[in-house]
Every structure is written in C-alpha cells, then in structure tokens.
Amino acid sequence: MELRMKKVSVIAAAVAATLAAGSAFAVDFHGYMRAGVGVSADGGQQVTFEKQKIGRLGNEGDIYGEIQLGQEVYNNNGKTFYVDSMIAVTSNGSNDWEGTASNCGTTVSHPDGQDPSATTKCVDDAEFALRQFNVQAKGVLDFAPEATLWAGKRYYQRHDIHISDFYYWNISGAGAGVEGIEAGPGQLSFAWVRNDRNDNFKLGENNPGDTPDAGNDGGAANVNTLDLRYAGLPVWENGSLELGLNYALVNETDDASDAAKDAKDGVMFTAELTQGLDSGFNKTVFQYGTEGYSKTMAFYGDGSWYGAEANDGASGYRLINWGVIGMGQNWEMGHQLVYGVGEDMWDGQDKLETMSVVVRPMYKWDDNHKTIFEAGYAIDDNDGAENKFGKLTVAQAWSAGSSFWARPEIRVYASYLTADKDDNSNAFDGGRSDDTFQFGVQAEAWW
C-alpha cells in the first residue's frame, strides 16, 4: 500500500510539473478570418467593389486570414520580453487546394500546362505574407519603466473603420520604437518604420507615378517614416484626444531614377477626438498631408504608402467621422462619413474631392440572431469629372452574442451595387453593365 501511494505521489508530481511547464511556455494564439462563397447575377463569382467607400458587408469576394502566435519568453524583476509573429493568407476561394504553386505559368491558351510566354507567375493561387515578427520589451527603460521598447515588423497602433475596412492611420511595417511613455495626462510614442514606395502605382496620363530606384533592395524608392504620437489626452467627460505627426523621408541612392531623386519629403498631421457615449462611441478625425501624403488624403490611404511621385507643392486634407451607437434595446448602428481633398498632385490636376457615406443598422432578434442592413454612397470629383458609387445590402446573421462586435458570425446576404462613371465605362459584367446583384454566405471571426 505504501509503495502504491509513493507511485501515485510520483505520478502526481510529474503531472503537476508538466502542467506548470506548459503554463510557463503557453503560446498566445490570436487571429482573424473571413471566408465564404458568392455569385453574381451577371454570371461568375461575386466581386469586391470600392468597399472602403461604400461598405464591406456583402462586398467581399476574397478569403483572408491572420494567424498570430506570441509568447512571453522572459519575466524577471519587472522586466519582460515578448516575441510576436503573424502570417496572413489571402485567396479568391476558387478551389479546394490553393497554394503558392497553383496554376503557375498557365494561360487560357495553355490551361493544362506551362505557357513559355506567360508573364503571370501564378493564377488563382493563395498568397502568404509575413505581417508581424517582432520583440517587445517592457520595464527595461529606466527613465520610463512603463513603456514598451520594440523592434521588428509589426502592426503599429492602427486606426480603422470596421464597416468599410478603411485604415486611415496605419504605418505598419519593419521598424523600431518606444511606445506608452507616461507624459503628463497622456502617453507619448515614437517609431521609425520603413515604408518603401511601390513603383508599380500609376496615376494620371502625364505622370506615370513611378519612382524606381535600382540601388535600393526591391527596386523602389526607400521611404522611412518617423512617427510621433501623443494619446489619451482628456478634454472633457468621456472625451479624449490623440495627436500624431508623420514625416516621410525619401532616401534615394545614386542609382535612383530622376523621379525618385526629385521626390520630396512629406508631413502628415492627424488629430483624433474620441467621445464615449452611454451606448457606444464616436470618433472625429482631421488629417492634413503635404507632398506625397496628398495622395493619402485623396485615395483613402493610411500613411503606409507614400506618393513620392506627387508634384512638388501637392497637399491634401481629410475629415472623418465614424462610430457605433445603440438605439434602444434591439437596434445598433455603425456609420462612416469621409470627405477628402488632394490638390496639385500631378501636372494639370487642380483639385480632387472624395466623399463617402456608409451606414450599417442592425436589428437583434435574440442573443444570436440579427438582421443587418448596409447602405453606402460615394462620389469622386476630379476637376469636375465625377464618378459615383452605391451599394445596398441586407443580411441575416447568426453570431456568438448580440453585440455589434460579436464574432464569430455567419451571414447570408444579398447586395446591389452600382457605378456611374464620368467616362461612361461600365464597372461590372466585364464592362457590359453599370450595376449588379450578388448573393452569398460569409463567415467572419476574430479571437
């Protein structure tokens, strides 16, 4: 009996040690996903059309996911080190097997094999991306033990509107910084992030927009973004202010093109007022940008890409209001209002104005069942040439809770999309129609 009890004690101790070790090395698992299936009344798969301007509900034809794994690897005397990582994947959901080698080098004329003249490397395949890989250290700065010192690649203090997937302040990328320094009533953060200019962007007949730099890794102009923010400044009851300044430094090499050498550094200023409400919140944002940041204001940019090819003296600004509020026991509504201006961005261009209105009211039948409506309308006016876009969506949804933000959620939807373009071109059905209907089912989750 005594021997048996000793064996039990040894086993219990081993199990306890294993559990303790598992707790010490527990990995934080977070993520996001959206996926589904949809068709267009014109034939073929559903489309994704101007969702930042007219809303994303019933207007996403892709599959997208993020897998985030992180772990605290050191904790001693108030000092911690955390390693974070994230892989993202996107595809159009056309097949069961979607990978980086799917249908590579094939064309319509060579559907079953390699086409030696093909310029497209892969068709209808999945794309994988390294989105985050960084180290975050807390308690290591003697002058600010509450702050976080970080380096690597990361999502950095992103600001977005969920109902349109519109990121209006987001310089994420590879970099380093210190965030969360207590300074008076708020917190101060500073970062340096690399945001090289993609030289494939083209806009304007007389200005191709390319800023190639053969001497830089990747062949595009090297842009370094310096970011300074002061957040959490109380202004009145339930109201707080965040202020930010971004400086884009174009760092060309001797082998850079003339366009890259002529590119000017730019400044983007952001002020965001957040108002807490009894049944939700509201945010009002003002942004102003010079030089390449003028295009950020005009084309729903977020600051992570810099329009280095913009004309010298270009400028722009943007006003945004968005939020989510409860309206009684069963109704909630999200909205966005956007007005942006870009001026003198390329030769012959004077003023581009963009306006967007999106509303998403939701009725909750019970804790897990809701009906969602979304309507969006947008106008782009470039020196009198107007493009108008619209969308109406109705969806029945089942979610893990009744909140506007409750996820996972499965939704069945029907959408009507329309486009009225200044050049009379058609946006749908391969250029044969100016409107379309689509129907589908989508799941969305974050954890």
Curated annotation (Swiss-Prot):
Belongs to the porin LamB (TC 1.B.3) family. It comes from the Bacteria. Homotrimer formed of three 18-stranded antiparallel beta-barrels, containing three independent channels. The record marks 32, 64, 97, 281, 405, 446 as: Greasy slide, important in sugar transport. This is Maltoporin. It is a multi-pass membrane protein. GO terms for biological process: monoatomic ion transport. InterPro entries: G_neg_Bact_CarbUptk_Porin, Maltoporin, Porin_LamB, Porin_LamB_sf.
